[in-house]
Amino acid sequence: MKGGVGLSKRSSAETALLLGALVFYLYIAWSVPYSTTDDLQWGMDQGLRWWLQGSLNSRYVGNFFAVAMCHSPLVKTLVMGLTMFAIPLLMARLAARGEERSLLPIYLASSAGLLLMPPVMWQETYAWVSGFGNYVVPTLLFLVWLLLVRRIVDRGGHRLL
């Protein structure tokens, strides 16, 4: 099934595996503590002022997510967990190129690749709420953009160059 996720055609084992991965990533997100510096500053009124004034840096979208996640543990868990689940899924969608049979193995390999990244990289991105908002969420948005570009090109509606 080209173009769609095809969840209706998945076996119950595949669906259970994907739901298990989602629960796993939500648990990891729930377990990530707030840092005692950046995350607490973003969670205070000062962090909101920084974002509204754009006075800290020019990462407006990332800072928006950092402020939202630092103000609410529920938002943090949902944004981080869903993003952690979605990045390997979108990577798999890009790599599978419409071959639904390949999606699950590629998803598992992509998840393994992300989970096995060096601890130093993990600490600066996935285990730091502000860093996650500034670096990982934009990665998800970039993957969405790539999928949209692929859909346009595959439909033949637009030429890129």
Model-predicted segments: where are they?
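Membrane-interface micro-motifs in multi-pass membrane enzymes
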Residues: Y107-R150
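Transmembrane signal-anchor helices characteristic of membrane glycosylation enzymes that use polyprenol
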Residues: R10-T36
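Membrane-interfacial loop-to-transmembrane alpha-helix junctions, especially the N-terminal start
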Residues: S12-T15, G98-A109, H158-L160
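Short hydrophobic/aromatic helix or loop-helix immediately within or flanking a transmembrane segment
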Residues: L52-T83
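Transmembrane-helix motifs of polytopic, lipid-linked glycan transferases
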Residues: G81-I106, L114, V144
